[in-house]
UniProtKB/Swiss-Prot annotation:
BP terms from Gene Ontology: isopentenyl diphosphate biosynthetic process, methylerythritol 4-phosphate pathway; terpenoid biosynthetic process
Pathway: Isoprenoid biosynthesis; isopentenyl diphosphate biosynthesis via DXP pathway; isopentenyl diphosphate from 1-deoxy-D-xylulose 5-phosphate: step 4/6
Signal peptide per UniProt: none
Cofactor: a divalent metal cation
Positions bound to a divalent metal cation: 8, 10, 42
Complex formation: Homotrimer.
Species this protein is from: Pseudomonas fluorescens (strain SBW25)
Annotated InterPro entries: MECDP_synthase, MECDP_synthase_CS, MECDP_synthase_sf
Protein name per Swiss-Prot or TrEMBL: 2-C-methyl-D-erythritol 2,4-cyclodiphosphate synthase
Similarity-based family: Belongs to the IspF family.
Keyword Zinc: no
């Protein structure tokens, strides 16, 4: 059994939506990123890669590679799943914490869970997504960006 932790941050930029956990959410900003900016799936990918001792998403999907410009993070996550399966691991469960003042996440949580479960090839009850604010403190509280912590448990397949 292995445990991995992932953390990612993206700054808000011009735009009218953000993508979190594979779900497109209307917002008065977008997220600045080389790929689609899905900070949930980036943190989750890092947690999975870390648990399997496979490095991080920067190693596998460098932001200097034009191939990944605007990339769909669900495609990247599915690639990560293939890597961990190839090393003899399967996902036991994942837990994701979104840290953001806005937008409200509650209406989107169940959709995120369903997409993540599908991409990880696991059951819905093995995926948790929750959100919190920082009570208007720090960069997330000032609505300058979004942060996500992810934890993943891997089990031998």
């Amino acid at each position: 059994m292995r445990i991995g932790h992932g953390y990612d941050v993206h700054r808000f930029a011009e735009g009218d939506f953000i993508t979190l956990g594979g779900v497109r959410i209307a917002h008065h900003h977008g997220l600045l990123a080389h790929s689609d900016g899905d900070v949930v799936l980036h943190a989750l990918s890092d947690a999975l890669l870390g648990a399997a001792a496979l490095g991080d998403i920067g190693k596998h999907f460098p932001d200097t590679d034009p191939t990944f410009k605007g990339a769909d993070s669900r495609v990247l996550l599915r690639h990560v799943v293939g890597l961990i399966h190839a090393k003899g691991w399967k996902v036991g469960n994942v837990d994701n914490t979104i840290v953001a003042q806005a937008p409200k996440m509650a209406p989107h949580i169940e959709s995120m869970r369903a997409l993540i479960a599908a991409d990880l090839q696991i059951e819905l009850d093995q995926v948790n997504v929750k959100a919190t604010t920082t009570e208007k403190l720090g960069f997330t509280g000032r609505e300058e960006g979004i942060a996500v912590h992810s934890v993943a448990l891997l089990l031998r397949a």
